[in-house]
C-alpha cells in the first residue's frame, strides 16, 4: 500500500516507487514532519531532538518541559500564534481581530483514488493509480478545522498536497494566509532554484545558496506572472543534472502565489508554497469551507533531470485532460506576426492557401477580427464578428479556409474590456476598479470582474455564438495585463476560480477544441492552465537564441508538449536578431511547433525548408512530445544549447544543438548524451555512423566545425535492435564452440543492411572485450565494380539471362580462392594476413598486411557469404529481404549508377533467387521484422 498508518507510534508513511514521506502525531497532538526523501521502511521519528532553546517558547500542554518547542521542531502545517516564529503556513483571524490557530490532531482517513478539489484544477488519477490521506487538525478555541489532503501517485513518484479550511464556529473568521504545503528539514545545506523573468523573457533559472533568513518570491499580479513561476526546487549543494538530491514544489494555480524558503537559527530549513498573503484576506462565514489550491511534490536522488522527468510525466498523464495531450497536433501558422491588425478575410484565405502548399495544417486568425478592432484601443468585450473587415460571415471564412485543406483557429481574450466598447458603455461597473478611484490601465484595457457570474455568463454566451458559427478547431486564449485595483481581499482568488469556471464550461461544451493558453506569451504558464489547455504559448519572444533559454528554464517543470513554439521571420520582431531558418526550426521543434510569419514574403529556398522542417517534425513528433527529456547544457553559461529526447524503450533519440557563442579558431565541442542503453549500439541516421550507448554518454559526439553564427544541428539515433538480438544468439553459439577463432558471415541482398548489421555486431563484440575484425567481401571480385557491371552487361548480351545467371556470384565473377585463403589463414592462427582492398575505379586495388594477433572473431560482410564456393565460415547469418526492398535501399544508398534501371533491377532479382537457394546454408536468419531465429 502507498499509505500506511502505524497506530502504536502514530506515524503516517507515504510511499511512492522511490520515495518515502513520513509524519507523526506526537503526545501533545501536534503533527510533526519526520522525513521526505529516498525510500525507506524505517520509522524516522529518531530524527526528532529536544533541547532547551533560549527564547523558543513551550506550549502550555508541555508543562514544565522546556525542551519542547514548536519553534525548533519540524511541523507539517505550522500556524501563527503557537510560539513558532518562523514563516508559517496558516494565519486565521477571528471576529475580534485575534490571529491564532493552535492546530491539534483530530482524525484521519485513508481511501483509494485521488481527492478532488471543487472548482480548482488538480492532479487526477483513477482508484488504482492513487491513494488519498486526509488528516483533520482542529482548534476548538479558534473554531476552525484544517483538512490536510495528500494524494499519493505511487508509480509517478509524486505526492500532492492541498488544504481545506472550515469554519466550525458561529461567527466569521478570516483567512489571512494559507499555504498549500510546508516542508521542514532538520538538516541540510540547500540551494534554492527559482525561475524569474519579465515579459518576453520568462523563466530564467536562478540558483541561490540558502543562507540564514528567508528567500521569498511570488506574484501579486492576479496571475502566476512572467516575473516568477509558481515553482521551486530545493537542491542539496553540488546537485547536478544527473546526481544529487533535490525537491520540487509546483503550484497548480494561476493566480497570486508566494514561495518562502527559510534557514532558521538552528540551521533547519522550511519551504512553503501557497497563496500570497498580500492583497489576500478571505472571510469565511459559519460552516463555510475554503480550499487552498494544490501543490505537487516530487523528490529525486538522481539530480535535476530525473526530477524534471517526474514532473513531465505527471503533467502529461495526470494534469492535462485534453484529448490532444497524447495526439499529434496540427502544425499551425498564426496571423499575428504575419499581419498584426491589418488583415481581411482574403488575407486569411491567402495565408491558408500559401501555408497549405507548404504542408502546414492550420491557420489561426489572431487579434483584430471582432468589433471595431483595428488597433489595441477598442472593442475588447464586444465579441461580435466584424463582417465588413472579413468580407463576409465567419462561417463563410471558415468554409473558405477548410476548402484549402486547412484547419481553422481563432484568438480570444475573454477576461478583458476596452472603455471604447459597447459592453463597457452598458456595464462600466463590470470592470475591476476601486470605488471612487480611476482604474489602472494596461495596454489600453481594463480587467473584467470574472469573480462575478453574470459577467462570465455574458462573455461566455458571446464566445459560444462565435464558436458555433462553424467548425473551429483551435482557440488561443490570451490575457494581456496584470490585475490592479484589488477592491477586496477575496477578489484575486475568486477571480481565478471564475476563470477556471469559464474554461471548464468551454472545454465541456467543445470537447474537440484544441485550446492554447497565453498571457502575453508565458505570463500564465502554470499547471493550473495546463489542466484545461494542453499547451501554452511559451513566450511572445520568438527569437531562436532567447528561446533556447526560455525553453530551458520552462523544462525544469513543464514538458515539451506544453510549450508553444514557432518559427518566426527575421530580423526577429522582438530582438532584431538574424538566425538561419534551420536554427529557428530546430529551436521551435523543442515545443509544439508552428510558424509566426508571412510565407508570401519567403524565398523558394525558405519555403522548401518549411516543407522539410514539417516533414522532420512529424517524423519525430511523438519522440519529442512523449519522450524522456534531457538537458545537455546550460544555455546561460555554455557556448551551446543542447537537449535531447529519448523514447521510453530507449531505442530512439533526437539530439538538438544550437551554437550560442562564436570565436575564432574554436575548439571542438563535444556533447555527451544521456538516457541511452550503455550496451546497445546506435546508428546516427544522417552520417550512418554507429556508436555504443556508453560511448555516446561518456565520450559524447564531436560537433562539426561551426561555419556560421548561431548554427544548429540535429542528430537522430536508432538502436540497432537486430544486432542486439543477433549478438545474443551468436554469443550462445560461440560459448558452445571450441574453436579459438571463429568466422561469421553476414549475407543477403545488395543494400539489405549487411554493413550496418555487421558493424553493429562488431561493436557488441568489442563492448564485451572480444577483439573482432570486419572484412568486406566486396574487395574480392575479379574486376572492380565499374568493370564488373560492364562484364555483366556483356555476358547478358552474349548469353542472355541464363548466361547472366551462370555468371552472377560464381567463380567467374568472384575470386573465391583468394578469400578462402584469408579464412584458412585466420583459422590457422596466423597473426599477419594479407588482405586485398578494392575501390570503384581503375587502379584502386591494393594489398595490405593486417595484424590479426589477439583477434578471435572474423566478421565477413558479403552478399555471397552463404555461397557453396565459400569455405571456412563457421556461422553463416542470412538477412531476409525482397528484391523490391533491396532495390529501394540501393536507390536510397545512392552508391551505384542506374540503380533503378531495368537491367540492374533484373540483376537484383536473379541475385535474390540465388540467395534463396543459399538460405539453406544459414545457421541463423534475421527476419524482415528484426527477429533472429535458427535455421
From Swiss-Prot:
InterPro entries: Aldolase_TIM, Alpga-gal_N_sf, Alpha-glycosidase_related, Glyco_hydro_27/36_CS, Glyco_hydro_36, Glyco_hydro_36_C, Glyco_hydro_36_N, Glyco_hydro_b. Its cofactor is Mg(2+). Disulfide bonds: none annotated. Coiled coil: none annotated. This is Bifunctional alpha-galactosidase/sucrose kinase AgaSK. In the N-terminal section; belongs to the glycosyl hydrolase 36 family. Optimum pH is 6.0. Active between pH 4.0-6.5. One of its GO terms (biological process) is melibiose catabolic process. SUPFAM superfamilies: (Trans)glycosidases (SSF51445), P-loop containing nucleoside triphosphate hydrolases (SSF52540). Homotetramer. ATP binds at residues 748-752, 824. Residues 721-935 are annotated as: Sucrose kinase. It comes from the Bacteria. Its EC number is 3.2.1.22, 2.7.-.-. Optimum temperature is 50 degrees Celsius. Residues 1-720 are annotated as: Alpha-galactosidase. One of its GO terms (molecular function) is alpha-galactosidase activity. It catalyses: Hydrolysis of terminal, non-reducing alpha-D-galactose residues in alpha-D-galactosides, including galactose oligosaccharides, galactomannans and galactolipids. Substrate binds at residues 366-367, 443, 476-480, 518-521, 540. Bifunctional enzyme with alpha-galactosidase and sucrose kinase activities. Produces sucrose-6-phosphate directly from raffinose. Binds ATP. Phosphorylates sucrose specifically on the C6 position of glucose in the presence of ATP. Hydrolyzes melibiose, raffinose, stachyose and synthetic substrate p-nitrophenyl-alpha-D-galactopyranoside with high activity. Low activity against locust bean gum, guar gum and synthetic substrates xylose alpha-D-4-nitrophenol, glucose alpha-D-4-nitrophenol and o-nitrophenyl-alpha-D-galactopyranoside. The active site is at residues 526, 606. Mg(2+) binds at residues 176, 277, 280. Keywords: ATP-binding, Glycosidase, Hydrolase, Kinase, Magnesium, Metal-binding, Multifunctional enzyme, Nucleotide-binding, Nucleotidyltransferase, Transferase.
Amino acid at each position: 500500500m502507498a499509505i500506511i498508518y502505524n497506530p502504536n507510534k502514530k506515524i503516517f508513511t507515504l510511499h511512492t516507487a522511490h520515495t518515502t514521506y513520513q509524519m507523526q502525531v506526537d503526545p501533545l497532538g501536534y503533527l510533526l514532519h519526520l522525513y521526505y526523501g529516498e525510500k525507506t521502511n524505517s520509522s524516522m521519528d529518531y530524527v526528532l531532538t529536544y533541547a532547551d532553546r533560549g527564547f523558543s517558547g513551550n506550549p502550555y500542554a508541555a508543562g514544565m518541559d522546556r525542551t519542547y518547542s514548536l519553534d525548533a521542531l519540524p511541523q507539517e502545517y505550522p500556524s501563527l500564534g503557537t510560539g513558532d516564529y518562523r514563516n508559517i503556513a496558516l494565519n486565521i483571524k477571528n471576529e475580534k481581530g485575534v490571529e491564532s490557530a493552535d492546530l491539534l490532531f483530530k482524525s484521519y482517513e485513508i481511501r483509494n483514488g485521488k481527492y478532488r478539489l471543487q472548482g480548482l484544477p488538480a492532479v487526477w488519477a483513477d482508484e488504482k493509480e492513487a491513494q488519498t490521506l486526509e488528516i483533520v487538525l482542529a482548534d476548538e478555541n479558534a473554531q476552525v478545522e484544517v483538512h490536510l489532503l495528500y494524494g499519493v501517485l505511487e508509480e509517478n513518484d509524486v505526492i500532492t498536497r492541498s488544504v481545506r479550511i472550515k469554519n466550525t464556529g458561529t461567527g466569521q473568521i478570516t483567512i489571512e494566509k494559507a499555504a498549500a504545503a510546508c516542508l521542514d528539514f532538520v538538516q541540510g545545506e540547500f540551494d534554492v532554484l527559482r525561475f524569474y523573468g519579465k515579459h518576453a523573457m520568462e523563466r530564467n533559472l536562478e540558483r541561490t545558496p540558502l543562507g540564514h533568513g528567508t528567500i521569498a518570491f511570488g506574484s501579486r499580479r492576479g496571475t502566476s506572472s512572467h516575473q516568477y513561476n509558481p515553482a521551486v526546487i530545493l537542491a542539496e549543494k553540488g546537485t547536478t543534472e544527473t546526481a544529487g538530491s533535490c525537491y520540487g514544489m509546483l503550484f497548480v494555480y494561476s493566480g497570486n502565489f508566494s514561495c518562502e524558503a527559510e534557514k532558521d537559527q538552528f540551521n533547519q530549513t522550511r519551504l512553503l508554497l501557497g497563496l500570497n498573503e498580500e492583497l489576500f484576506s478571505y472571510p469565511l462565514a459559519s460552516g463555510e469551507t475554503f480550499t487552498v489550491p494544490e501543490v505537487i511534490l516530487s523528490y529525486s536522488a538522481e539530480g535535476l533531470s530525473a526530477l524534471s522527468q517526474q514532473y513531465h510525466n505527471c503533467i502529461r498523464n495526470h494534469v492535462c485532460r485534453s484529448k490532444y495531450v497524447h495526439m499529434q497536433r496540427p502544425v499551425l501558422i498564426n496571423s499575428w506576426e504575419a499581419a498584426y491588425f491589418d488583415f481581411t478575410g482574403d488575407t486569411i484565405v491567402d495565408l491558408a492557401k500559401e501555408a497549405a502548399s507548404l504542408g502546414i495544417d492550420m491557420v489561426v486568425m489572431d487579434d483584430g477580427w471582432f468589433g471595431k478592432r483595428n488597433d489595441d484601443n477598442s472593442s475588447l468585450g464586444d465579441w461580435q464578428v466584424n463582417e465588413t473587415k472579413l468580407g463576409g460571415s465567419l462561417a463563410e471564412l471558415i468554409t473558405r479556409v477548410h476548402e484549402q485543406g486547412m484547419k481553422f483557429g481563432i484568438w480570444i481574450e475573454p477576461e478583458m474590456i476596452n472603455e471604447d466598447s459597447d459592453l463597457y458603455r452598458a456595464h462600466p461597473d463590470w470592470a475591476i476598479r476601486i470605488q471612487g478611484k480611476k482604474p489602472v490601465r494596461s495596454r489600453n484595457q481594463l480587467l473584467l470582474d470574472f469573480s462575478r457570474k453574470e459577467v462570465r455568463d455574458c462573455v461566455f454566451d458571446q464566445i459560444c455564438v462565435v464558436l458555433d458559427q462553424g467548425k473551429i478547431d483551435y482557440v488561443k486564449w490570451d490575457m494581456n495585463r496584470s490585475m490592479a485595483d484589488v477592491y477586496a481581499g477575496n477578489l484575486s482568488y475568486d477571480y481565478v476560480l471564475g476563470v477556471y469556471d469559464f474554461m471548464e464550461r468551454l472545454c465541456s461544451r467543445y470537447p474537440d477544441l484544441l485550446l492554447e493558453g497565453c498571457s502575453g506569451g508565458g505570463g500564465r504558464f502554470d499547471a493550473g492552465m495546463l489542466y484545461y489547455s494542453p499547451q501554452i504559448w511559451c513566450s511572445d519572444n520568438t527569437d531562436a537564441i532567447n528561446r533556447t533559454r526560455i525553453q530551458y528554464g520552462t523544462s525544469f517543470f513543464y514538458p515539451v508538449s506544453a510549450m508553444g513554439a514557432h518559427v518566426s521571420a527575421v530580423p526577429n520582431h522582438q530582438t532584431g536578431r538574424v538566425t538561419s531558418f534551420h536554427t529557428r526550426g530546430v529551436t521551435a521543434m523543442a515545443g509544439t511547433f508552428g510558424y509566426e510569419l508571412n510565407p508570401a514574403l519567403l524565398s523558394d529556398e525558405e519555403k522548401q525548408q518549411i516543407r522539410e522542417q514539417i516533414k522532420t517534425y512529424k517524423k519525430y513528433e511523438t519522440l519529442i512530445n512523449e519522450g524522456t527529456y534531457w538537458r545537455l547544457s546550460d544555455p546561460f553559461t555554455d557556448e551551446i544549447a543542447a537537449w535531447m529526447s529519448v523514447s521510453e524503450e530507449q531505442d530512439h533519440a533526437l539530439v538538438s544543438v544550437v551554437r550560442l557563442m562564436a570565436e575564432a579558431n574554436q575548439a571542438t565541442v563535444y556533447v555527451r548524451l544521456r538516457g541511452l542503453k550503455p550496451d546497445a549500439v546506435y546508428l546516427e541516421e544522417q552520417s550512418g555512423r554507429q556508436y555504443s550507448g556508453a560511448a555516446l554518454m561518456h565520450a559524447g559526439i564531436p560537433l562539426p566545425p561551426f561555419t556560421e553564427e548561431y548554427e544548429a544541428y540535429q542528430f537522430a539515433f536508432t538502436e540497432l535492435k537486430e544486432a542486439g538480438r543477433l549478438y545474443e544468439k551468436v554469443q550462445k553459439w560461440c560459448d558452445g564452440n571450441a574453436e579459438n577463432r571463429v568466422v561469421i558471415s553476414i549475407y543477403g541482398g545488395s543494400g539489405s543492411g549487411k554493413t550496418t548489421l555487421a558493424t553493429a555486431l562488431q561493436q557488441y563484440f568489442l563492448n564485451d572485450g572480444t577483439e573482432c575484425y570486419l572484412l568486406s567481401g566486396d574487395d574480392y571480385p575479379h574486376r572492380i565494380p565499374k568493370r564488373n557491371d560492364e562484364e555483366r552487361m556483356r555476358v547478358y548480351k552474349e548469353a542472355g539471362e541464363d548466361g547472366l545467371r551462370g555468371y552472377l556470384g560464381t567463380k567467374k565473377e568472384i575470386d573465391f580462392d583468394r578469400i578462402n585463403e584469408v579464412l584458412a589463414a585466420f583459422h590457422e592462427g596466423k597473426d599477419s594476413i594479407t588482405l586485398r582492398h578494392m575501390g570503384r575505379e581503375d587502379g584502386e586495388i591494393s594489398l595490405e598486411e593486417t595484424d590479426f594477433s589477439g583477434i578471435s572473431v572474423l566478421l565477413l560482410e558479403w552478399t555471397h557469404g552463404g555461397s557453396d564456393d565459400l569455405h571456412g565460415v563457421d556461422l553463416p547469418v542470412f538477412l531476409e529481404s525482397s528484391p523490391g526492398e533491396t532495390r529501394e535501399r540501393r536507390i536510397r544508398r545512392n552508391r551505384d549508377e542506374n540503380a533503378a534501371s531495368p537491367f540492374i533491377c533484373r540483376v537484383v532479382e536473379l541475385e535474390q533467387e540465388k540467395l534463396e537457394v543459399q538460405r539453406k546454408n544459414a545457421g541463423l536468419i534475421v527476419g524482415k521484422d528484426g527477429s533472429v531465429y535458427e535455421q
